């Protein structure tokens, strides 16, 4: 009989997996729409390209500052509460675009994006390993790959939807308000349902032995450097590609 990737020890984790996987799409969407904000803010607030890069600096700066606190939250309260914390911060930051559109302050939008970045940090740190325990351990790779595919779709849909809305005169608060309502609704759902504790599964797999000094592992150090360079290249290209397309290739 073919083994289900969502069933384990008599439990079916399909619904929780679908809920968690939807979050992969949402943070991909959040990153995708971020790239559209640069030219939008340049036009709306008459700021330079360099100044508009504060949008990326706010989000990815939050990743740098919030990474260790996110790990502390997970260690103390578990992955489930880490996901919920990330969703709440993500939702609050998104809803902050509503007063931001009234105040019409670029720096308030930057603050909103920083809060969103803090939420995304908690969310990504928690949700990635969460998918690995929502079913049979032997199928963990299949589940996380499936979830990550939705993240890629979010990256594609984000700029398409964002560009269509923002450059057609729609209030910038509308797409973010809808995202905020959705993620806060998911946070409420997750707070009401029972899910497994990934920490217990991890401790069982490692016999309670956890590497306390990962920086001493060369593979970890090189992996971290690779991620740093990859994100730097990706962000640098994505942030100003629309400007490049308009000014150099004359695409409108």
Residue ranges, per PLM feature:
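Extracytoplasmic gate region of multi-pass secondary transporters
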Residues: 34-38, 216-252
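Cytoplasmic helix-loop-helix junction between adjacent transmembrane helices
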Residues: 112-149
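Extracytoplasmic
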Residues: 15-43, 47, 127-128, 237-242
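Juxtamembrane intracellular "pre-TM" segments in multi-pass secondary transporters
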Residues: 1-14, 199-223
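Central cavity-lining transmembrane alpha-helices of secondary-active solute carriers
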Residues: 54-72
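Helix-loop-helix hairpin linking two adjacent transmembrane segments in secondary transporters
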Residues: 103, 143, 147-198
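C-terminal ends and interior cores of transmembrane alpha-helices
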Residues: 88-103
């Amino acid at each position: 009989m073919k083994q289900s990737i969502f069933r384990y020890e008599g439990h079916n984790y399909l619904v929780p997996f679908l809920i968690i996987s939807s979050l992969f799409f949402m943070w991909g969407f959040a990153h995708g729409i971020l790239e559209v904000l640069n030219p939008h803010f340049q036009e709306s607030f008459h700021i330079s390209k360099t100044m508009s890069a504060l949008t990326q600096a706010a989000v990815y700066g939050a990743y740098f500052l919030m990474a260790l606190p996110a790990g502390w939250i997970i260690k103390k309260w578990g992955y489930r509460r880490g996901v919920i914390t990330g969703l709440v911060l993500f939702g609050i930051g998104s809803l902050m675009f509503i007063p931001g559109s009234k105040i019409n302050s670029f720096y308030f939008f930057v603050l909103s994006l920083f809060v969103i970045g803090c939420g995304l940090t908690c969310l990504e740190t928690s949700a990635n390993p969460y998918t690995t325990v929502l079913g049979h351990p032997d199928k963990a790779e299949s589940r996380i790959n499936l979830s990550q595919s939705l993240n890629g779709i979010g990256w594609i849909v984000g700029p398409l939807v964002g560009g269509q809305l923002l450059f057609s005169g729609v209030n910038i608060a509308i797409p973010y308000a809808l995202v905020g309502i959705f993620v806060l609704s998911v946070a409420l759902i997750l707070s009401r349902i029972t899910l497994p504790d990934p920490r217990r599964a991890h401790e069982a797999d490692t016999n309670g032995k956890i590497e306390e000094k990962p920086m001493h592992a060369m593979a970890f150090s090189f992996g971290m450097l690779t991620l740093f360079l990859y994100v730097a290249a990706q962000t640098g290209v994505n942030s100003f590609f629309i400007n490049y397309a308009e000014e150099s290739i004359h695409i409108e």
